[in-house]
Every structure is written in C-alpha cells, then in structure tokens.
C-alpha cells in the first residue's frame, strides 16, 4: 500500500458527484451524500470527509469528526477524541488494504477513536485493534460502539 494517499475531500458539488458512485454500490445507511449536501458551503471550509483516489476515481472514503473533551464519555483521561463514521470502499477495491489505510490515517492523529460498525464489519475493526466498549444504555442508545485506545488511554469506567 505504498504511495496511497488519504486526502481531505473538498466540500463541493464535484465531490457530491463522486459520492454518487458509492450510493450505487453501498447500503443506504452508509451514504454520505446527505452529510455532504448539508456541508456544502465554501470550498475552503474544514471538511470532515477523507478519501483515497485511484487515478481520478474516489474509491474509498470516511467521515472523521473531532469530539470535544467536554463530551467525552468513553475515555480516561477525558480528552478530545475522533468519531469515525461511514468508512466505505467500492466493491472492486475491497480487500486490498484501502480501508486499513483510512483507519491508520485516523490513528495518526494519536487521539482515541470511537466508531459504530455496520454490516458485519466487526472482524475488520478487531483486526485494526478496536475493542467493544462496555455498553452503557444512556450513553450508547442502542449502538454498539467500538473504540481504539492509543497508548496511555483506557476506557472510562461508567460505574464511578
């Protein structure tokens, strides 16, 4: 996976067109088009969307949001963390390491990461070093989040 570059995707109509390919292949719950449409403002605004291009084609993408320390109910010590949403690789490019490249890019920020895996993807996330967060009904609201803990960080004990 040398020379594979993760790019911050611009929030514009050109990116919206590229996202349409994912809607053709993916599940409705993974589509980021609505997210992008809601974020189309200026080309230079900070985009939460990241992707990998193969030639001129966007072949893999994810959303990565930074959550402020004041809303941290997952990690000890409390700190800013990342929420990784909607990681998706087009079918022709799956099982070639592109998803791993995106996750490793997120890990490079050296912040804890939370994700809510979809579509039988737990095996992938476990391979990437994510663990199941202890379920807390009020916090998790029916989701089953997985978390990644960088060195020196542990899961918050919600009982205390």
Swiss-Prot record:
This is Uncharacterized N-acetyltransferase OB1458. The keyword Nucleus does not apply. It is an enzyme of class 2 (transferase). Its EC number is 2.3.1.-. Residues 9-151 form the N-acetyltransferase domain. Keywords: Acyltransferase, Transferase. The keyword Nucleus does not apply. InterPro entries: Acyl_CoA_acyltransferase, GNAT_dom, YlbP. GO terms for molecular function: acyltransferase activity, transferring groups other than amino-acyl groups.
